[in-house]
A protein has these predicted regions:
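A conserved short coil-to-beta-strand element within the FAD-binding core of flavoproteins
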Residues: 132-141
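FAD/FMN-dependent oxidoreductases across multiple families
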Residues: 71, 231-296, 335-338
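Helical substrate-recognition/capping region of FAD-dependent monooxygenase/halogenase enzymes
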Residues: 1-9, 13, 28-29, 38, ...
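An active-site-proximal "capping" alpha-helix that borders the catalytic cofactor pocket
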Residues: 298-312
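N-terminal Rossmann-fold NAD(P) dinucleotide-binding loop
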Residues: 19-20
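Active-site-adjacent segment of FAD-dependent monooxygenases/related oxidoreductases
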Residues: 47, 52-121
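Conserved FAD-binding catalytic core of PHBH/FMO-like flavoproteins
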Residues: 80, 120, 146, 150-263
């Protein structure tokens, strides 16, 4: 490949959801992007099925939220962990109405359709070139200023970096069965409309209400493999139907796919080496018990995109990219460690230990929410939360969502007198976010392009200091 053909600002290896989103975000910023994928076609069967309200907000930043919302199913329901007798042990709360990010808090979707929307979004940008059916043999082939590996758990780019894996302790094979169900069948109608984690020591399972599908409704069963199960044969209908016949049978649904996956919990140390960077499964993997695997990769893309744009455009030093791993690794590790703890509750197969587990919840179900961790140290003021957490997205007086008024820029929100006459190229939004600021005992906040809080201020002097401390020249 000649440099005249492929010289670009950023080359992305992998055109799955993470790579395609990153290419959309960089394309918006006018960067020259080449994105590669070894497969010519989108994988036609479902894999990830859930994302949260923060991720929908990221899709909004990419200008694709309305199309993705039309293709997905918003849900106000949570996730229930129940024991073998059906008693609820734990509940991840749902969110009624709009969540703090201006969208429903949970969404279910069909991954091939999501990928089609993301790839179609790339056609908006003449500065983004897509190379499908193109297998990269070495990163040395890529004549680009930066290379981002969004190429999954067997990442070529990660091997070139030499990242070090950190094992977080969970590795377990599960069977994943997607069914297209008759929406009028009585047994289908009787299924819960929320996700269920069945903590049955005889056979732990997960049941997910995904949404509508051609010819019916899609439901997913994830079934833990037990000693004696043959992974090569358990995918056969004759073997998996008996596992789920207490809910459905062949007369109620047809299998769309059955496959065995080993769920892993691992993070990599070393997300960057020179021009090489990682995002998504190439630098972390989580079991699906919190529904946050794809979400984590898309957060990577949102964090990395504005930093790459700032560096390439010359408004920030290259060292800004070092903050990517330092911020994201502890953040994603919080989610993975919670998923591992939930997996310990779900995957208990010793009957006496399961009875002891159930007794811990005799006083009532434990309620929990998604964590809201602080970013690690990096492009933010060194201060406790709410610095380093994501700012909510209110609707403005003119009807727009806040992010629509900001674009991919820094912003300052808060009390009007503090913002009046402030010398900065950041977007000023006086009177916005006052309830949030009052909750935290502050009067103003400086927001990054990914809407994480760079700094908060109690007075004008603190606000001026925060704006002066920005390592990126806003604009």
């Amino acid at each position: 490949m000649g440099s005249a053909q492929l010289l670009s600002d950023v080359a992305i290896v992998g055109c799955g959801p993470v790579g395609a989103l990153l290419a959309n975000l960089l394309g918006q910023e006018g960067l020259a992007v080449d994105i590669f994928d070894r497969e010519r076609e989108i994988y036609p069967l479902p894999r990830a099925v859930h994302f949260d309200g923060e991720v929908m907000r990221i899709f909004q930043a990419a200008g694709l939220a309305d199309r993705i919302a039309a293709a997905g199913r918003p849900s106000s329901k949570g996730m229930h962990f129940v024991n073998a007798e059906g008693r609820t042990l734990m509940v991840r709360r749902g969110i009624d109405g709009l969540g703090p990010h201006g969208w429903a808090g949970n969404w279910y979707f069909h991954q091939p359709e999501l990928e089609r929307i993301l790839r179609a979004g790339l056609t908006r940008f003449p500065n983004v070139r897509t190379h499908l059916g193109h297998d990269i043999g070495s990163v040395d082939e890529l004549d680009a200023r930066y290379v981002v590996g969004c190429d999954g758990a067997r990442s070529l780019v990660r091997r070139a970096i030499g990242s070090r894996p950190v094992d977080l302790g969970l590795h377990q094979p599960w069977l994943v069965v997607d069914l297209i169900c008759d929406p009028n069948a009585p047994r289908v109608l009787a299924l819960p409309d929320y996700s269920v984690q069945l903590c049955d020591p005889a056979r732990p399972m997960t049941i997910v209400n995904v949404g509508t599908a051609p010819g019916g409704v899609r439901r997913r069963w994830e079934i833990m493999l037990m000693p004696g199960d043959d992974p090569a044969r358990v995918v056969e209908p004759a073997l998996f139907w008996p596992m789920i016949n207490r809910w459905l049978g062949p007369e109620d649904a047809r299998p769309e796919r059955a496959a065995v996956y080993t769920f892993h919990s691992v993070v990599q140390e070393g997300w960057r080496k020179g021009r090489l960077l990682l995002a998504g499964d190439s630098c972390h993997q989580t079991p699906p018990f919190l529904g946050q695997g794809m979400c984590a990769g898309l957060r990577d893309a949102a964090n990395l995109a504005w930093k790459l744009a700032a560096v390439v455009k010359g408004s920030a030093q290259d060292t800004l990219l070092d903050s990517y791993e330092s911020e994201r690794l502890p953040h994603v590790r919080t989610f993975i460690e919670l998923a591992v703890r939930l997996g310990a509750v779900l995957q208990e197969t010793d009957r006496e230990a399961a009875r002891a587990r159930d007794r811990r919840f005799e006083a009532g179900a434990e309620m929990f929410d998604y964590p809201q961790p602080q970013l690690g140290p990096g492009c933010r003021v060194d201060a406790p939360p709410p610095v380093g957490t994501i700012f909510p997205q209110p609707r403005l007086g003119d009807g727009r969502l806040m992010d629509e008024a900001i674009g991919q820029r820094f912003a300052v929100v808060g009390e009007a007198p503090l913002l009046d006459g402030l010398r900065t190229d950041a977007v000023l939004l006086p009177g916005v976010g006052l309830n949030w600021l009052s909750l935290h005992g502050k009067r103003a906040a400086v927001l990054r392009p990914d809407r994480y809080v760079f700094a908060v201020a109690s007075d004008r002097a603190e606000l001026v200091d925060a704006v002066v401390a920005l390592p990126v020249r806003p604009g």
